Amino acid sequence: MSDMNKILHKWSASLKKGTDFDSWGQLVEAIDEYQILARQLQKEAQSPANSSDFTEDQKKTIGKIATCLGLRSAALQYTQSQEGFTLEDVKKLEPILSSIVTFNKEFPFDVQPVPLRRILAPGEEENLEVDEEEEDGGAGIGSPDLFPARVPGTLLPRLPSEPGMTLLTIKIEKIGLKDAGQCIDPYITVSVKDLNGIDLTPVQDTPMATRKEDTYVHFNVEIEIQKHVEKLTKGAAIFFEFKHYKPKKRFTSTKCFAFMEMDEIKPGQTVIELYKKPTDFKRKKLQLLTKKPLYLHLLQTLLKD
């Protein structure tokens, strides 16, 4: 089996796995599988011609499939809605993906690949020159999976309730930044880490901000933490990384981050401080982003069965 056939076989198996989860009603697993495959397809679609076995037309089709998977992921996050990209729509992608080399028909959906943005290896951003108008602090990276072409909005549904267990919903209301109006395509990556910086739950991205005004970027979006509060390990923390797109350099950058520790989990309004990048998941060398009264504004809701 050639390398290309191996890749196509791997992608097809991943898509089948996602549609199986989808048809079984295992939404969290389906979303995760779709998003993993979408990232792989986006990476291939954006690869230089001299490092890809696929033609430019084939890569365009691959990019469109990635967009469709992102649309299905978004549809699954809002299970009350009967609209959006359906499971039957996704199944129409299976024969296209498996025969991408010979596919020469019109793509069945009116979508476009995610716009080309530079893909950075972890740590690469550290070596790039920082703009003078950049935020206070040096350059750095956020999550290890810094991937500028992620489909915006990868929120997961609420976990099933369990007797005696507490579910946590965090509404990200707004973030205060001195140059809020200049941020392009801003979103927040939410992760739950242990003391060693290891993920305890799937990483989630908010959709892009709803509006910007003065010194605030508004999100007004709810995040369902993917672990019952009682099951979070001692010393764990919930991280919020604010990211935005830099058109001059064509990549998405982490601007700052905030975190909330376990003793801060309580119902009601919460305001937490912002720190300079790079994101310090181990919380050992923290530096405040600014001395100005600018914070991340949250609203916590606890639900116990």
Curated annotation (Swiss-Prot):
Q: Does the keyword Magnesium apply?
A: no
Spans annotated as Axin-binding: 153-220
Q: Which residues, by range, are in coiled-coil regions?
A: none
Gene Ontology MF term list: phosphatidylinositol binding
Q: Name one GO cellular component term.
A: membrane
C2 Aida-type domain: residues covered: 156-303
GO BP terms: determination of ventral identity; dorsal/ventral pattern formation; negative regulation of JNK cascade; negative regulation of protein-containing complex assembly
Tell me its family. Answer: Belongs to the AIDA family.
User: Taxonomically, what lineage is the organism?
Assistant: Eukaryota, Metazoa, Chordata, Craniata, Vertebrata
Q: Keywords of this protein's UniProt record, alphabetized?
A: Developmental protein
Key word Ligase present = no
Q: Which SUPFAM superfamilies match?
A: Domain from hypothetical 2610208m17rik protein
Xref: Pfam families: Aida_C2, Aida_N
Function statement: Acts as a ventralizing factor during embryogenesis. Inhibits axin-mediated JNK activation by binding axin and disrupting axin homodimerization. This in turn antagonizes a Wnt/beta-catenin-independent dorsalization pathway activated by axin/JNK-signaling.
Check the record and name the PANTHER family matching this protein: AXIN INTERACTOR, DORSALIZATION-ASSOCIATED PROTEIN
Q: Which InterPro entries match?
A: Aida_C (IPR025939), AIDA_N (IPR023421), AIDA_N_sf (IPR036818), C2_domain_sf (IPR035892)
This one is known as Axin interactor, dorsalization-associated protein A
